[in-house]
Structure formats: structure tokens, C-alpha cells
């Protein structure tokens, strides 16, 4: 790659890993970047901005600003491939309402039901999230297979609030019309907006509530949304679903053949670091 700088990023509370990596990189040019525990700390664009101060443009990738980001699983698999070991397994965390939360190495193509069995089964009447609690997708179909992008399987009681927030309803527009005050808290706490990408969920809510798509605001802002879900699961004081309004707007633009312009329109928010959401506060809200 011809990289001039190599950085390993991890959360500072992983003290064992920090100690091991500090010893491993001693005497090399590799740096450690120790992050506080906040959401979404592992987002690649957030990492690029936090470490380099550069914003990846709308529709772009880290390479557009001279960076390559690889997670630890990818780096491990690269090492396996260089050693001639075929990479046919995926590390998947099984958690939530299960008997024994576990991380397993599962072959690509393994039914999700087998992963649930490895965790001792679900406790009570549950639905499931493939992926993380905020960005993952709801499913009741555990016959689907592990793929190269599968990272987690969560068992969630059907009456848990997170299930309602991840469910799309035709009533969402009616509720938005009645309850959304346009306080813009969803926009103020948006990580991508803070990086200068002009993501404005409150305008997507305005368009949804009024039925007027011309009110969605900056089209590039719609395409810059990473669907982290922070606006829905934490920012909105009325329990509304701004991320779903953004999803609807993005899907409609894509169906019309609209494409983003690769650019960064605005300067990053000077208070970016102060807008980071501590993980423990998010978990408290999700529970």
C-alpha cells in the first residue's frame, strides 16, 4: 500500500489488549490510538476523522482521503491467506436472551439455528437480530446462512422496545405528523453531520410527516447517512424513527436514479468530540 503511517485503534478500557499491543509495537513505527467507549466508535469514517481529521466525502471510501481501514477479523484473515490457509469461517457473536452468550467460528453457509444451539438456545419468546442491536436486521428465519458479513446474532424478547423501533409501520407518517416537534435533536447528535456531511434526519421527518418529498433537504445528506440508528434509539425525545425516514428517502432517490456527489460541503463541527455518545448511556436507553 505504501502507507506512511500505521495506526491500531482500540478502546482504552480493553486493558489487556492495550498492554499486549503496546509491547508488540514497541520499537516500530506503528501507533496505538486509544478511544473512549462511545457509539459508533468502530465506524470506519469516524475512525478516519478521529485519527486524521479528514472527512470521507459523500459516496466515497477512506481511500479517497488516503486511508485504508481494516477490522481485526479482516487482518487475521489476510494473515491466514498469506500462510496458505483457506478462509472459510466467520467469527460470530451470539448474545442477548440466550442461555450461554458465546462467540463461535462458523463455516460460511452454516444455518443461524446452529449458532443459536451453540449458545444453549433462546430464553423465552424471542425474535432475532442479525448484526448489532442498532444496525442489524430483524428476522424470525434462522434457516438463513452465515455469510462473510455476518457478525452477530442477538435473541431479543418480542416485547422489547428495540423490536418496536426496528419495525416499520404505515402509521409512522401519521405519528410523525402528530408528534415530531422539529426540535432537530436527531440532526444535532448525528455523527456524520458533525463531520460536515450535512445529514439532517429532522428534514426527512418533515418530508415524511407532510408527504412532501421536496422537504428532505440536502440530497447528499440523505446519501451520507450510515444508518447507525443513533437518531432513533437515543436522540429522539418522542420515540420516533428518524432513521427509517432517512431509509425511505434514500430508497426513493435511488429508485429515481439519483446519485450522490462526491464532496464534503461543510466544515466539521468544532464540538465533534463532545457530541460522542458514551456506550453506557446508550445501553441504559436501550434497556
Spans of model-derived segments:
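Flexible, glycine/charged-enriched surface loops at secondary-structure junctions
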Residues: 3-9, 32, 88-89, 123-131, ...
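Short, surface-exposed connector motifs at secondary-structure boundaries
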Residues: 1-7, 98-100, 185-187, 230-232
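Active-site gating/interface segments in enzymes
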Residues: 38-42, 46-55, 125-187
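Ferredoxin-type iron-sulfur electron-transfer modules in oxidoreductases and energy-metabolism complexes
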Residues: 156-177, 187, 193-276, 287
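Phosphate-binding glycine-rich loops and their immediate beta-loop-alpha structural context
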Residues: 1-15, 179-181, 202-205
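Hydrophobic alpha-helical positions that pack around
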Residues: 7-112, 118-123, 132-134
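Conduit-forming functional cores of very large proteins
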Residues: 4-24, 28-35, 117-120, 147-165, ...
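A glycine-rich phosphate-binding loop feature that marks nucleotide/adenosyl-phosphate handling sites
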Residues: 11-13, 95-97, 129-139, 249, ...
Amino acid at each position: 500500500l505504501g502507507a506512511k503511517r500505521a495506526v491500531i485503534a482500540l478502546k482504552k478500557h480493553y486493558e489487556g489488549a492495550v498492554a499486549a499491543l503496546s509491547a508488540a509495537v514497541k520499537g516500530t513505527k506503528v501507533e496505538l490510538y486509544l478511544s473512549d467507549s462511545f457509539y459508533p466508535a468502530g465506524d470506519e469514517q469516524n475512525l478516519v476523522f478521529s485519527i486524521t481529521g479528514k472527512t470521507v466525502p459523500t459516496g466515497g471510501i477512506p481511500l479517497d482521503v488516503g486511508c485504508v481501514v481494516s477490522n481485526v477479523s479482516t487482518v487475521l484473515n489476510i494473515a491466514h491467506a498469506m500462510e496458505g490457509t483457506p478462509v472459510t469461517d466467520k467469527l460470530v457473536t451470539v448474545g442477548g436472551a440466550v442461555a450461554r452468550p458465546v462467540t463461535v467460528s462458523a463455516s460460511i453457509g452454516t444455518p443461524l439455528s446452529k449458532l443459536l444451539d451453540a449458545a444453549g438456545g433462546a430464553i423465552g419468546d424471542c425474535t432475532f437480530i442479525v448484526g448489532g442491536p442498532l444496525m442489524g436486521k430483524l428476522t424470525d428465519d434462522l434457516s438463513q446462512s452465515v455469510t462473510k458479513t455476518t457478525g452477530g446474532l442477538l435473541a431479543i424478547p418480542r416485547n422489547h422496545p428495540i423490536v418496536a423501533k426496528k419495525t416499520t409501520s404505515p402509521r409512522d407518517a401519521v405519528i410523525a405528523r402528530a408528534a415530531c416537534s422539529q426540535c432537530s435533536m436527531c440532526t444535532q447528535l448525528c455523527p456524520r453531520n458533525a463531520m460536515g456531511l450535512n445529514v439532517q434526519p429532522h428534514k426527512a421527518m418533515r418530508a415524511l410527516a407532510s408527504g412532501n418529498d421536496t422537504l428532505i433537504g440536502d440530497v447528499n445528506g440523505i446519501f451520507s447517512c450510515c444508518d447507525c440508528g443513533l437518531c432513533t434509539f437515543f436522540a429522539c425525545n418522542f420515540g420516533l424513527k428518524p432513521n427509517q425516514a432517512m431509509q425511505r428517502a434514500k430508497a426513493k432517490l435511488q429508485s429515481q436514479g439519483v446519485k450522490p456527489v462526491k464532496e464534503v460541503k461543510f466544515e466539521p463541527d468544532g464540538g465533534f468530540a463532545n457530541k460522542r455518545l458514551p456506550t453506557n448511556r446508550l445501553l441504559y436507553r436501550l434497556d
